[in-house]
Amino acid sequence: FIDIFNLSNNHIMDQGPDGLSRSIENIERLEKKYFGAGQSLAESRKPVIVDINGYKVALFSYCCYSSNSESYAKLSSPGPAPLVYEYIKQDVDEYRDSVDFIIVLPHWGIEHENQPTYDQVILARRLIDIGVDAIIGTHTHTIQSFESYKGKSIYYSIGNFLMNDFQLTASDRYYWSSLNKETMLLEMSIFDGDLKFNEIFLKFNKDMLPEVVSVDSLITNIKKINTTLIYKTANLKHENYEPNLDLSLKFNGKSMQVINNSQLVSSNLTARALSIKAKL
């Protein structure tokens, strides 16, 4: 059923380096492929290259720094690949001429929201500018808006699909909102050199299993959130802004938390300019 595993997420190191190693060992034992994490920074950034209708497609994944930010891959230590523009550009430049398509799958965004931040939009469009052919985001537990930029698809977050070993308690039923129970799959196809995606929408049923539904049956108003994204970013000069996410650390009384300082697209732009000259 699953041939390739994306390991780049903010929980892959919850059981430490041994947990990551065991995960990789089990994937390899099943003769499957993985990407997005590894025993070093270089290994975590290696793509999986798949063949689709005779076209070579490179899959890269990177994870935004979050509450467990010390667990990310470093030069010689294991973890998921960190979501850093300079790393992604280096990787795209290395593989651009040897594959037909490059897809980046970032694990990012503010949880339980239907819009990305301005920083995410800037980073996504900068990645398309340097040769990425599609972006498919995860992490927020919700469906977020999506767009086509320069004819390339950008899905900021596709929501939840399966929650392994989910304990369906009364509190779970209460706290897991209707928006968290909606998701979508992307069916990818390549014909005549064109990379296309077909959205398949799903909802979790009472047993927390996904069922295919029509877009009109979703509580998430896809048309509205996509229209808001287009309207709010219509005049965004993304090339004038810093491409990396604006993050900071904050102690919440128990632990250090990573805060995304950029505003959601549904609010006003507060992205960081590259320089005064660029801003002008």
Label every model-predicted segment.
Residues 3-8, 33-36, 57-61, 101-105, ...:
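Structural recognition of the beta-strand scaffold that forms the well-ordered cores
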Residues 14, 64-86, 110-113, 162-178:
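Acidic/histidine-rich helix-loop elements
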Residues 8-30, 113-120, 146-150:
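Metal-dependent catalytic neighborhoods of phosphoester/phosphodiester hydrolases
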